[in-house]
């Protein structure tokens, strides 16, 4: 592939962003490209090795996002911003999102390398309540099904233990005032 824009220039002096812009311009409007295809064409044009491209890839992707002349169109497709009017950009993005919403969602299966088919091992990833298929454990279900009589019995036993410490009759006779507490504190600090 030859790009007329760079006629007479050294390929080694060209940046990947310049080449990407030129490739998209020569393809024309409505010929957006997947990121991988764009990188492959840049690599072929610049005649760079896989190692060189791999090392430059993070910087190229950052430049592609920050350069105002490129626009992501979803599904890792890229185009030139000049191809789209502002209103058309919003519509284009919305239509791509609408298409994605209608597509069935595929749930990623979690893989735990430490499980190794051991049935006795505990999989802590299965108890996330935010998962769509979460079912509460039996302990939670048992708690919800507790009898109220059991709870009342616990409260009564707790009250009886408190009555052993301070009988109910004595509670009415005791009056606390803040002054009494302060005086005791002052006496202790002066000693």
Curated annotation (Swiss-Prot):
Keywords: DNA-directed RNA polymerase, Nucleotidyltransferase, Transcription, Transferase. GO terms for cellular component: DNA-directed RNA polymerase complex. InterPro entries: Asxl_HARE-HTH, RNAP_delta_N_dom_sf, RpoE. Gene3D superfamilies: RNA polymerase, subunit delta, N-terminal domain. Residues 14-83 form the HTH HARE-type domain. One of its GO terms (molecular function) is DNA-directed RNA polymerase activity. Transmembrane segments: none annotated. Residues 119-191 are annotated as: Disordered. Pfam families: HARE-HTH. One of its GO terms (biological process) is regulation of DNA-templated transcription. It comes from the Bacteria. Belongs to the RpoE family. Participates in both the initiation and recycling phases of transcription. In the presence of the delta subunit, RNAP displays an increased specificity of transcription, a decreased affinity for nucleic acids, and an increased efficiency of RNA synthesis because of enhanced recycling. RNAP is composed of a core of 2 alpha, a beta and a beta' subunits. The core is associated with a delta subunit and one of several sigma factors. This is Probable DNA-directed RNA polymerase subunit delta. It comes from Streptococcus thermophilus (strain ATCC BAA-491 / LMD-9). The lineage of its organism: Bacteria, Bacillati, Bacillota, Bacilli, Lactobacillales.
